Each structure stands twice: as C-alpha cells, then as structure tokens.
Amino acid sequence: MAVIGIVSITPALPLIANELNISKEKIGILVSVFTLPGIILTPIFGIISDKLGRRFILLPSIFILGFFSILSFFARDFYLLTIFRFLSGIGAASLGAMNITLIGDMFDNVKREKILGYNNSVLNLGTTVFPFLAGILANIHWSLVFALPSLAILIFIWLLTSFKDIAPAPKISEKYFRNFLNLLKNKVLIKIFIVNLLTYIILFGSLWTYLPLLMSQRFNAEPFFIGLTLSSMSFTTSIFSIFFGHLVKKISYIKLFSLSFILYSIVLFLITVVSEWYYLFIATVLFGIGHGLNLPNIQAFIIRLAPDTHRSGIIFLNRTISQVGQTAGPLISAGILFLFPNTNVSINAVFYFSVILGILLAVFSQFISTKNN
C-alpha cells in the first residue's frame, strides 16, 4: 500500500495526458500532488503515532487512500482527478514510514538489518507487480489503474479486526520535543536526510515520472511495455534488498552508498542514448541493483540513529523528506521541460540533471561517518 498509489499510475501517464489533453509539463502533477500532503502530515502522524499508538494512524490512513482512489477511478476531468489524488495522498502519507516504524518496534538491532532487507524486497515486489498490472489495465482503459490503490479498502477491513499495537505509546511531553530537536542536530542524521532527499528527486524526477513519457514519445511504447520496463527495475531492487544484511558485513555502508550512486548516474545516462526501448531493460536492471543497495542502507542508518522513544518521529520525518523529493522531482523536471521546448532535448536534459545529482551524491556520501555524532 505504501507504493501502490504512485507506481500503479506511472505506466499510464502518457495515456492519461493524451486522453485528458494535458501537456507533458503538467502530467507530473498527478505524482507531485499525491506526495504533497505527506510533506506536512507525515511528521505530525509520526508524533501522534508515538503518543496514541500505531493503529490510531494506520487504519484511517488506509481507508482514506482506498476511498479517494475509488473516486479517482470515476474522475474524467484533470482538475477533479488532481483533487482526488491529493486527498488519497493524505491517506498514503503515513504508510511509507509506518512499516519501518513497526519493524523498529518488533525487532532488535541484530535482526533489524536483515528484516529491513526483506521489507524492501516485499516493497519492491509490489513495485514490480503493480506497474506490470497497471500496464495491462491501462491498455484496456486508463482509469482502471486507479482500481489498484482502491484495494486499500480490503486491507482496511482486514486490519480492523486483526491489527493490534505492538509498542506501548509513551507520553508526549516538552522533554520529548526538546530531545527530538536535539536529535536533529546530529550531523550524520542531517547528511542521511540530504541523501534521502536527493535520492527521491532522482527517482521521481526522472525514472518513475518521465521514463514513461520518454518511452511513449521516442519509442511509441504502449503502457504494457512501459509497466514491464519499470517492473524490471523493481524486481532487481527486491532481489538485492534481500541480501543487504549479508552485504553490509563484507562491504562498508559508505562504499555501498558510492556504488549505488555511481550506478544511478551510469544508468540515467544510458537511458538517453539507447536506440530501442528494450535496451532500457539493461538500464533499469542496473538501476534496480543500485536502489536495492541504497534504500535499506538509508533506513538502517535512520533506525540506528533514532532511539526507541523517538523512533517513529524520526522515521516519519525521514519519510517527509522522501515525500519532499517525490514532490519536487517531477516539478523540477517539469521546469526543465519548460526551459527546453524541443522534446528530445528536454527529455534528455531531465536525465542529465539526475546524472549530475548521482555524481554529487557519490562524492557527498564519502563524508558520512558511521559513528553517531
């Protein structure tokens, strides 16, 4: 549920743009407006979760996501669809952080890194299957892609009777907020937040939002093949996430960061030069390897730096930063498209920008200490 609201619609973005007569600069709004509510609400949900428990936030969130996704299915006007996407994004705001919080609640330090790898594997299994299914559904009708996040209603009904809070909710006091603010002075934590922000600007500014547009315009690819290509990246990510717990025993966290971002840059450049759409499989598989090393690495740092009493708040703040990247990425790319009216040049410029960010991240990650300071 944490990823379905985005990855289930990206294969259909070119088709939605054509059907609703929306320009290539505006179509990314459907992604940005979904992630926008999380920028404000996610840290608030994290604090409430620490005070009132995980169930208090989790159940309403899943219901809201499902309900407004159903309404999105029936929308035939771009602006109405945008409103429903925004409202469903309110429901999705807490979900990406909640699963990490629950892992922190349930497992000790010895098991967390392995479980984080498994969690990312499951997460990316979703981002493998859903774009593929969305591509099939979009070939029937573009609105059917919104049927997938509507499944959240069924999850809500199941959790309503089966989910109970695992961790006791501590009292929120002035001391809690004071200690929380002190945690934000941690230099390592700040650097990880920066890495997380730029990672999602790359991911959503180029791959998830504008790779479908590139495939549609340059190769005339149908939604099914767009979904298949995006799924290949997520499948590889899920495989490598499984082995994260083993890899960190042999390769340092910092080297894994560097390898991830170097792969990002290589892949994003390759995307601009391939001559046939099926060559993109090589690029997306390589990107999936890099992302499978990067994402659990970020999460492992965050959990290790966050004490039990503030874990939810810190994880939710990190999720907020992710959503800033998810929101800003498509908007930055839209700005690049606006600056370069020629379609081929503008699409390439979007990916060149991400190549530069990847190189900068590879250098920046070398200044991250593995010590808590």
Name the predicted role of every residue range.
Residues 21, 53, 74-80, 108, ...:
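Helix-breaking motifs and short loop linkers at transmembrane-helix boundaries and internal kinks
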Residues 40-76:
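Conserved MFS/SLC helix-loop-helix module at the cytosolic interface between two early adjacent transmembrane helices
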Residues 42-53, 240-252, 337:
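Helix-to-loop junctions at the C-terminal end of transmembrane segments
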Residues 68, 79-87, 278-286:
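Paired small-residue
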Residues 78, 84-123:
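Cytoplasmic helix-loop-helix junction between adjacent transmembrane helices
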Residues 118-161:
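Helix-loop-helix hairpin linking two adjacent transmembrane segments in secondary transporters
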Residues 150-169, 361-369:
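C-terminal membrane-cytosol helix-exit motif in multi-pass small-molecule transporters
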Residues 164-193:
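Juxtamembrane intracellular "pre-TM" segments in multi-pass secondary transporters
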